[in-house]
Amino acid sequence: MRYSLRQDIAVEPVIAGWYGWSYLLPPQTLARFVHNRFNRIVESYLDDPQVHAAAVRQRRMHGGPWIHAHEHRDAIEAWYRETAPRRERLDELFEAVRRLEEDILPRHHGECLDPVYQELPAALAGRVEVFYGRDNRTADYRFVEPLMYASEYYDESWQQVRFRPVTEDAREFALTTPMLEYGPEQLLVDVPLNSPLLDAVFRGGLTGTELDDLAARFGLDGERAARFASYFEPTPAASEAPAPASSSEEDVLEYVGHACVFARHRGTTFLVDPVLSYSGYPGGAENRFTFADLPERIDHLLITHNHQDHMLFETLLRIRHRVGRVLVPKSTNASLVDPGLGGILRRLGFTDVVEVDDLETLSCGSAEVVALPFLGEHGDLRIRSKTGWLIRFGERSVLFAADSTNISPTMYTKVAEVIGPVDTVFIGMESIGAAASWIYGPLYGEPLDRRTDQSRRLNGSNFPQAREIVDALEPDEVYVYAMGLEPWMGVVMAVDYDESHPAIVDSDLLVRHVQDKGGTAERLHLRRTLRL
């Protein structure tokens, strides 16, 4: 008898006690989130958990700084007090960056910066470069990111996973609640997120002895080992197992939820912005694409940008053992707001990661991939690591524009002059996004005033902007996606649409615009098989 992980078991990444995502992996950004956001959330909660309880009961408050576990105050307080000594090292790194930004660099206005290296706090000495901007007066810096990962501040013992059953499609918002064991059905395991042990969990096909050995290597025994074993089920023999929905060798283009699209072309497989749902529980949406539908091999994994709903660690870890090469946009900043995606993914256990620059072309098996410029949706911050992926499947070209915003009206006209017409366009139209501080606030040197923050929202394209993209690229098919409509996206998003919401109005207008011109258009939801 062999055993594999049940399809209804989530394995959630945990970093420093919080739901793991990309800005929590580099130590310099983790320190900012812990100091500027997480500590404040916990202390507010401990002061008055009923305020948090009242907030999370209101749908419009989801996504705010509220803990979704008001009945577990004692457990959260105990965890917070016990981990305080471990947070001291992150506090040290936070203070070092604060001193550099607020005390050291502002004293220099054009003269040689060599003396700065002698002033650097120990946490940053030998790990940053300082320089001037082109005005020759504003001093700035960048991290030497590999040295930050090699430092004592990058501590893999902060990393865990939490096993728990999923009972419905809808997921509770996870980014503001400590990831503890809140019930006997949950299990926290100490393990680096890049550990091959996790690949063994997700690959499955384990004998009983191998399953016992895996529990032991996770440091589990007794009741905890038995709980771990309960997350696995007998694996059907190969002749009895149902074939995954994507196991056919036919060419296919399949939307599978939010911004995730699966494609197969002449035997080469692609997955864009992977976020997948679970299965194995009653009441789930019919015909949704789940982990069980994936092929054994994903030749090329493409990520458009570094937001939680496009680069979800929870999905990435579960499919890592299937993935060949990962394509990501190039980052050139090495700053707090723009850590390198390549470095993050390599520390997450991916070995073949390629960083691609604007309009660079790569051969990917039977297809060709081009990285297109991506403007907007990042709060007007200097963030380079974002791209739209154009994939040429033989004679047919498909653009995954993600949340690109057409704030430079002539750019797509100029792009079209280089790449030619595009057959199919996927475009996100969350035209009223969160304020920039919702993601980036903990990374700021000083907080934005509310008026400025609200003016720099993480917006996708509205109707006029999306229309100009479509008119410039002349596609036959246009699909609105990446709207957060699927219930499982609630784990990292907090959208609440009705028919009057600007995103729904804008996307309806775009669909009609394309259809009026004789094209095919649709706002996608859950799953859709398309021609390739």
UniProtKB/Swiss-Prot annotation:
Its EC number is 1.14.99.65. Pathway: Antibiotic biosynthesis. Fe cation 2 binds at residues 309-310, 403. It holds the Pfam family Lactamase_B_2. Contains a dinuclear iron cluster that becomes oxo-bridged (Fe-O-Fe) during O(2) activation. Fe cation 1 binds at residues 305, 307, 377, 403. The keyword Isomerase does not apply. It catalyses: 4-amino-L-phenylalanyl-[peptidyl-carrier protein] + AH2 + O2 = (2R)-2-(4-aminophenyl)-L-seryl-[peptidyl-carrier protein] + A + H2O. Its cofactor is Fe(2+). Involved in chloramphenicol biosynthesis. Catalyzes the beta-hydroxylation of 4-amino-L-phenylalanine (L-PAPA) covalently bound to CmlP to form L-p-aminophenylserine. Homodimer. Belongs to the metallo-beta-lactamase superfamily. This is 4-amino-L-phenylalanyl-[CmlP-peptidyl-carrier-protein] 3-hydroxylase. It comes from Streptomyces venezuelae (strain ATCC 10712 / CBS 650.69 / DSM 40230 / JCM 4526 / NBRC 13096 / PD 04745). The lineage of its organism: Bacteria, Bacillati, Actinomycetota, Actinomycetes, Kitasatosporales.
